[in-house]
Design a protein with these regions (language model features):
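Residue-level signal for nonpolar/aromatic packing positions in well-ordered secondary structure
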Residues: 38, 90, 109, 140-146
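C-terminal end-helix/capping segment
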Residues: 129-147
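Short helix-capping/linker segments at secondary-structure and domain boundaries
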Residues: 61-65, 119-127
Length: 148
């Protein structure tokens, strides 16, 4: 809730608001290509990783049985390989760069970190062989802003 009582509820909308009032460092990229790459990877992280992890969690975890009605364990299990397939793609991409969308930290890194952190309660393990994902996640999670 803002000082004037305005409520912003969606995480990307909140991040865009903060970027407008505090533009440095930019979370949504700079220049036409940089902004496009951040949007591309943000959507990939959200739709291919976070959603798969969320479906697994909501349909498998016992604490969610009252929230996800009906809770369909088969659907939760079906989403686990989707998350892992995306992580394999991400691992290949991260072999050539430090951050998800290029040379700078962005909202795509934030979304990816949250998704990977959420894999534990969703009962999805990050495969050991995904060294680039593990390196990237470790670096992102070690940032002071990730501990806030």
């Amino acid at each position: 809730e803002l000082d004037d009582g305005t409520v912003i509820t969606e995480s990307v909308a909140i991040c865009r608001y903060f970027e407008e009032i505090q533009p440095q460092p930019p979370l949504f990229g700079t220049g036409a290509l940089g902004k496009a790459r951040v949007e591309e990877w943000q959507r990939r992280m959200e739709l291919n990783l976070l959603m798969a992890v969320a479906h697994a969690f909501r349909h498998i975890h016992p604490a969610m049985k009252e929230w996800e009605v009906p809770q369909i364990a088969e659907w939760g299990e079906a989403n686990k390989p989707k998350a892992l397939d995306f992580l394999a793609l991400l691992d290949r991409e991260l072999a050539n760069r430090e951050f998800a969308a290029g040379d700078s930290y962005s909202i795509a890194d934030i979304t990816g970190m949250v998704a990977i952190d959420f894999m534990k309660p969703a009962r999805i393990a990050v495969p050991e062989e995904l060294a680039n994902v593990r390196r990237w996640h470790g670096a992102i999670a070690a940032r002071p802003s990730a501990k806030a």
